[in-house]
């Protein structure tokens, strides 16, 4: 690995330097020892970096210039919906009445915030076809886990606590089996058929009296719509199981079809994906969960309800699984999502899905002569191609992804889902222009040509980034996670 990276903030530290100072307080202070038990007090001084304010500003400005995001360039990361985040969302989120409020304020003082929460719940109920929605979960996987805990409580309350199996397709997001495990279930895999859809015969084989639920994304992770969803619903419901909808791919079907109309009993959404909350830097996210009326009494508490002309928290939820997030989730993301929904309207959301599907199919059609396309039918918002042709020249999908960096494009998701050899999952979203799509397509075609005629150029990529190829094996086996470890290495 060759590095042209910046020094760490700790490496810029010089003893005695500081960014600013505070005037001496004229208020009597107490020692830490008088306030905390000895077991909570550090024995050694914390090694905070000591830098001047200018050095601090330059350090983080330099790092920010090396970041890549949707505002920098094309970001076709499959199943992540890296769409443009409208700046009006940020303006609304910074309105002082919202941004300066506190979650412990009296309900009477935050009626506007509670109205936003209530109104967003109502909008999401309409979009998903669910009867009730909680906004508490802080991310997609958190929403998955919350829904599964609701399922678990429901089965136990109905004398069927023996139901401990959750069916997960082989093309599912990795968080699905992980969430099932965290919720105390066993994962059972159902195979895909030759069209990339759930194999109905295999589903009939794995469903049994212990089936608690099936977790599905529709369209699925291959970008293919599960056209047999009503038959899947019948099979699982007849066995006493429930249907869970992973909302990761909702961007493909808004105002076209609703999870509730497909027979799902619970759904999670990603406000940070479909509804333009900024993401890609680790958060904050938001993963609301919607349920049918039979499961409403199990939702996390409190819920925000409307009582006459006022909005308030409701803790009187009979079978509630309890609180799943401090206060009431990530409110700033609610503001952005609500702004987006109200700005777009139902017609706008429908056009979003139509454009997302059109863009994905356009890229797929143009690349089909240059890459292997495992599933030939029309896709929805994303699709998976395979790099098996390029592998014949010693170039793998990973190498092509690295080469894309040299052209200012963030690589698509690679080697996922696991059932496609040398897979590359591409999701362009609706917000990209035809010019951007053509640039990406032409770039991938040129990389495919390089793989054939000049493979070393691809194998040695990237050539223009701050950091060249990482030694991924060493990074995985001997990670340096603390500055203290870095000092020891040196």
Swiss-Prot record:
Enzyme Commission numbers on file: 1.4.4.2
Cofactor: pyridoxal 5'-phosphate
CDD domains: GDC-P
SUPFAM superfamilies referenced in this protein's UniProt entry, alphabetically: PLP-dependent transferases
The UniProt record lists the keyword Oxidoreductase: yes
GO molecular function, one term: glycine binding
Entry annotated with the keyword Oxidoreductase: yes
The entry's keywords: Oxidoreductase, Pyridoxal phosphate
Transmembrane segments: none
Catalytic class of the enzyme: oxidoreductase
Highest taxon of the lineage: Bacteria
GO BP annotation list: glycine decarboxylation via glycine cleavage system
Residues that bear N6-(pyridoxal phosphate)lysine: 273
Pfam families: Aminotran_5, GcvP2_C
Job description of the protein: The glycine cleavage system catalyzes the degradation of glycine. The P protein binds the alpha-amino group of glycine through its pyridoxal phosphate cofactor; CO(2) is released and the remaining methylamine moiety is then transferred to the lipoamide cofactor of the H protein.
NCBIfam families: PRK04366.1
Subunit relationships: The glycine cleavage system is composed of four proteins: P, T, L and H. In this organism, the P 'protein' is a heterodimer of two subunits.
Similarity-based family: Belongs to the GcvP family. C-terminal subunit subfamily.
Protein name: Probable glycine dehydrogenase (decarboxylating) subunit 2
Source species: Staphylococcus aureus (strain NCTC 8325 / PS 47)
């Amino acid at each position: 690995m060759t590095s042209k990276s910046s020094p760490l903030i700790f490496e810029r530290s010089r003893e005695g330097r500081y960014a600013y100072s505070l005037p001496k307080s004229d208020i009597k202070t107490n020692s830490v020892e008088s306030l905390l038990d000895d077991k909570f007090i550090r024995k050694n001084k914390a090694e905070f970096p000591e830098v001047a304010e200018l050095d601090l500003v330059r350090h983080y400005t330099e790092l920010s210039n090396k970041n890549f995001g949707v505002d920098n360039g094309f970001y076709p990361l499959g199943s992540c919906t890296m769409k443009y985040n409208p700046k009006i969302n940020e303006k609304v989120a910074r309105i002082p009445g919202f941004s300066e409020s506190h979650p412990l304020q009296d309900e009477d003082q935050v009626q506007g915030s509670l109205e936003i929460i209530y109104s967003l719940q109502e909008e999401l109920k309409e979009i998903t076809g669910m009867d009730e929605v909680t906004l508490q979960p802080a991310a997609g996987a958190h929403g998955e886990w919350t829904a599964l805990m609701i399922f678990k409580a429901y089965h136990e309350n109905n004398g069927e606590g023996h139901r401990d199996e959750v069916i997960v397709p082989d093309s599912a997001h990795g968080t699905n089996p992980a969430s099932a495990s965290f919720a105390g279930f066993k994962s059972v895999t159902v195979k895909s058929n030759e069209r990339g859809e759930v194999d109905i015969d295999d589903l009939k084989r794995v469903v049994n009296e212990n089936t608690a639920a099936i977790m599905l994304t529709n369209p699925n992770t291959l970008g293919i719509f599960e056209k047999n969803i009503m038959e899947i619903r019948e099979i699982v419901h007849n066995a006493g199981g429930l249907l869970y909808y992973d909302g990761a791919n909702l961007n493909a079907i808004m105002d076209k079809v609703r999870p509730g109309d497909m027979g799902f009993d619970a759904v999670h959404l990603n406000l940070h994906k479909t509804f333009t909350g900024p993401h890609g830097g680790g958060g904050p996210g938001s993963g609301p969960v919607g349920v049918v009326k039979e499961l409403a009494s199990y939702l996390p508490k409190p819920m925000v309800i409307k009582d006459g002309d006022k909005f308030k928290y409701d803790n009187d939820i009979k079978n509630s699984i309890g609180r799943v997030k401090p206060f009431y989730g990530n409110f700033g993301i609610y503001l952005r999502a609500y702004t987006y929904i109200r700005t777009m309207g139902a017609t706008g959301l429908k056009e979003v899905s139509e454009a997302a599907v059109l863009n994905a199919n356009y890229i797929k059609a143009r690349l089909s002569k240059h890459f292997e396309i495992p599933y030939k039918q029309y896709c929805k918002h994303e699709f998976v191609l395979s790099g098996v042709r390029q592998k014949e020249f010693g170039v793998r999908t990973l190498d092509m992804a690295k080469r894309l960096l040299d052209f200012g494009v963030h690589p698509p998701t690679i080697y996922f889902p696991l059932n496609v050899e040398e897979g590359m999952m591409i999701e362009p979203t609706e917000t990209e222009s035809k010019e951007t799509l053509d640039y990406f397509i032409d770039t991938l075609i040129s990389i495919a040509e390089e793989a054939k005629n000049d493979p070393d150029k691809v194998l040695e990529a990237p050539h223009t980034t701050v950091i060249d190829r990482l030694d991924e094996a060493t990074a995985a086996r001997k990670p340096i996670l603390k500055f203290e470890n870095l000092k020891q290495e040196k």
